[in-house]
Amino acid sequence: MPRECELCGTERAVLRRPKTGDLVCRACFFHVFETEVHQTIVEAQLFRRGDRVAIGASGGKDSTVLAYVMKTLNERYDYGLNLFLLSIDEGITGYRDDSLETVKRNQEQYGIPLKVLGYKELYGWSMDDIVASIGRKNNCTFCGVFRRQALDRGAASLGVDHIVTGHNADDMAETVLMNVLRGDIARLERCTDIITKGPDGVDGDEDDDETEGCGAGRSGFGGSGIRRSKPFKYAYEKEIVMYAYFKQLDYFSTECIYSPNAYRGYARAFLKDLESIRPSSIIDIIHSGENLHVAGQVKRAVQRTCTRCGYISSNELCKACVLLEGLNRGAPALGVRSDKSRAVREARLDGTSDIGRTIPRWEGVQRSSATAW
C-alpha cells in the first residue's frame, strides 16, 4: 500500500530522502531541497545584491541542477543576481563536445547567457593533445590545474564577482578523505570551506595534485579578485540526481573518458561503502573536516604572482605555466615533479630551450568589455 508523505501527510510519498530518511512526495522534496540550498546561501552570506555570478557549467547533473536552482532561488527570493553560464572546453572528443551541446540547450531553457573558453584557445593544447603526449598517468593533474585557471580567466572576461560550482556533499566528504590519506594537513583545514580560501587558493576539490589561484585570505578573495563558493555543500549527490530526474532536467551523464583511474575514484568507492552502512557518514565527515584546526607551526604557502603570466601563485611560476612549459619543451614530467627537484632546477637555468607559447598575461576582472553569448 502506498505510504503518505511524512511532511505534508496528504500526498503519496515517491522517495525516501537519502539525507534524512524521510518519506516525501514530489512537491515536498522539491521544496525542502530548494529551501536547504537557500538556507546554505543565506547562512554563509554567499552573495551581495547586484553580484554578477558565473555558474560553472559542464552539462553534468550537478551543474545543471545548480543552474536551475540558482535561477529559481534568484527569482523566488529576489537575490538581485546577474547570472551567467561559464563552460570550459578541455578538448576531449566524444565527451566535452557532447556535454557542451547540453550546456547550450540549458542556455536556451534557462535564458542565462553562456560563455565558453577552450584549453586550445588559452594554452595551445587540448586534453586530447596532452594525453597523446603524456599518456593517461598524470592527465588529471594537467586538466585540474588548467581548468581552474581557465574558469578564473573566463569569469574575468565576463566581469563577474563570483563563481559558483556544483560540488556537492559527497565531493566535500571525498576531499576530506583524500587529504587525510595524503597527509595534506594544510589543505585539510580549509577543504570544507564553502567559500574557497587559502594563501594560494588550494582547496583540493579536484583530482589534481597542485591547485592555485582560486582565492586567498579569509574573505574568500584571492589574486583573481573573484570569489568561489559551493551552494551544494550539504546536498547529497543522490538527491541531486533525484531532483534532476523528477524535474526532467536536461543533463549529460557520461563520465570523463580520461578519469577512470583518478585518485578521487578510490575515495568515492570507500565513501559509498560507508554510506551504505551509515547514510549520515557524508555529513559526519564534512563536520569533522569543519572542526579541524591546523597547529600554528604548520608551514603555509606565501601568496605571490606568477612572474610569467601574472596569475596568483605560491611559487615564482604558477603551476599552469610550469605544466605548459613542460609540454612545450617535450618534457611534460618536469611540470609534474616538485619545483625543488634537480631536473626542474636545471631546466629553469637552461635558457637555450624555447619554452614555446605562454599563457596570456592576467589582466584581472574586465567589467567594461564583458561579453557572453
UniProtKB/Swiss-Prot annotation:
Keywords: Cytoplasm, RNA-binding, Transferase, tRNA processing, tRNA-binding. Coiled coil: none annotated. It is found in: Cytoplasm. One of its GO terms (cellular component) is cytosol. It comes from the Eukaryota. Pathway: tRNA modification; 5-methoxycarbonylmethyl-2-thiouridine-tRNA biosynthesis. GO terms for molecular function: nucleotidyltransferase activity; tRNA binding. SUPFAM superfamilies: Adenine nucleotide alpha hydrolases-like. The keyword Transferase applies. Its EC number is 2.7.7.-. One of its GO terms (biological process) is tRNA wobble position uridine thiolation. It holds the Pfam family ATP_bind_3. InterPro entries: CTU1-like_ATP-bd (IPR056369), CTU1_C (IPR032442), Ncs6/Tuc1/Ctu1 (IPR000541), Rossmann-like_a/b/a_fold (IPR014729), TilS/TtcA_N (IPR011063), tRNA_thiolation_TtcA_Ctu1 (IPR035107). The keyword Transferase applies. Plays a central role in 2-thiolation of mcm(5)S(2)U at tRNA wobble positions of tRNA(Lys), tRNA(Glu) and tRNA(Gln). Directly binds tRNAs and probably acts by catalyzing adenylation of tRNAs, an intermediate required for 2-thiolation. It is unclear whether it acts as a sulfurtransferase that transfers sulfur from thiocarboxylated URM1 onto the uridine of tRNAs at wobble position. Prior mcm(5) tRNA modification by the elongator complex is required for 2-thiolation. May also be involved in protein urmylation. Belongs to the TtcA family. CTU1/NCS6/ATPBD3 subfamily. This is Cytoplasmic tRNA 2-thiolation protein 1. It comes from Malassezia globosa (strain ATCC MYA-4612 / CBS 7966).
